Amino acid sequence: MRMLSGQHVLDIGSGTGTLALLIKEKHPGVDVVGIDPDTQILEIASRKARRVRADIRFDLGYADRLPYSDSSFDRVVSSLVFHHLAPETKVVALREAWRVLRPGGELHIADVGRPRSALMRVAVIPFRLFDGFGATEHNLAGRLPDLIMETGFDDLAETGRVMLGIVCLYRAVKPRVTSGNRRTSHN
């Protein structure tokens, strides 16, 4: 993921800050904000950032109610969050990501996807046991890319797979101009 100095990046479901810290380490000139609903986890993230003197802000909040202005980020990232969300919450969270992204901004999601083989179907069982069969079903059925496109994003690409192919890496772009017939977060 290419980022330019001065860009603003939001990490939705930042947890202990691992992804936010990695982004800041690789791109020290970007402004990184993490958001997570767990205060104890955010305290850990803040300590980790202070320990390495990384200027990262961590905010308390939810993916489906982002406390940020419209068009305030150049990139929105999320790692292993969406498979925890109920289908209707996934939709609202994607609309919120769309809302806070600037036109031309990119969404990057790493999350459990549709298994492509019998081995992968077996490999996702621990995710399903830990996170619940209902929560993960939507992702395993391959619905996340459809939801991303239905939200109004363009240029959706699966850019790779990691963790034995269980986790899909998706990239999509908020259009610079939205047409009247395009489904957006406001429709």
List each language-model region with its residue ranges.
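Class I SAM-dependent methyltransferase SAM/SAH-binding core
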Residues: 10-12, 16-65
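C-terminal alpha-helical "lid/dimerization" subdomain adjacent to the S-adenosyl-L-methionine
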Residues: 25, 108-151, 155-168
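C-terminal lobe and adjacent flexible extensions of AdoMet/dcAdoMet transferase-like proteins
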Residues: 169-187
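Conserved alpha-helix/loop element of class I SAM-dependent methyltransferases that forms part
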Residues: 1-5
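Short glycine-centered segments of the SAM/dcSAM-binding site in methyltransferase folds
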Residues: 8, 104-106
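A short acidic, Gly/Pro-enriched loop at the edge of an enzyme's catalytic core
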Residues: 64-75
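A short SAM/SAH-binding and catalytic strip from SAM-dependent methyltransferases
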Residues: 75-88
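A short glycine-rich, Lys/Arg-flanked "PGG" loop and its adjoining helix->strand segment in the class I
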Residues: 91-103
